[in-house]
Amino acid sequence: LQREEMTDEISASICDAYGYLNELMAKDVDLFSLAGLHSLIELNHRVLCGSDTRKRYEFHSHILETRKKFHGRIRPIRSWMIKNAGRLDPYEISAGFYCRMLCQPQLFIEGNHRTGNLVLNYILLKENEKLFVVTDETAFDYLEVSGAIKLSSMKRWRDNLLKLPSHCGTFEAFLRRSASPDYSRDS
């Protein structure tokens, strides 16, 4: 799979999105509540455009198309999250969300890896778990397992029954191994 080069502009947008995520955490926003869904899609807009109004204007049609597709694609993911909240541990929930949003059809038009990483850390942070930050040491494995997930489809029964659970388990194990106390709330 072709990997996008990490530029200063991409890094700035990701930092902007993390700042927004910090605001959401301070307000105790539930991203998977009906009211929180706007904030969830805003995270995607932030990782792609930041909060710069000129850039947002430039990508206005893309933002509108993303919102339209998002509202159709979030339902099964949100249902799964609600059904499993409190039943599964935070790493299982994080991996389950990430797999479901990254497989086909992807939740967003672009920025699924970046937004997914933010949201899985939001889930872990809410439960006071260690966070996962992509580093030079974890990037290759993260992108490899993410690439396998990305090639799976929620709409193909074989993928849904066989591949997706396997990918979720692999990603969950990767998260548990790679999460670091260096990025916790207390560090």
Where are the language model's segments positioned?
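FIC/Doc superfamily catalytic core
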Residues: 1-187
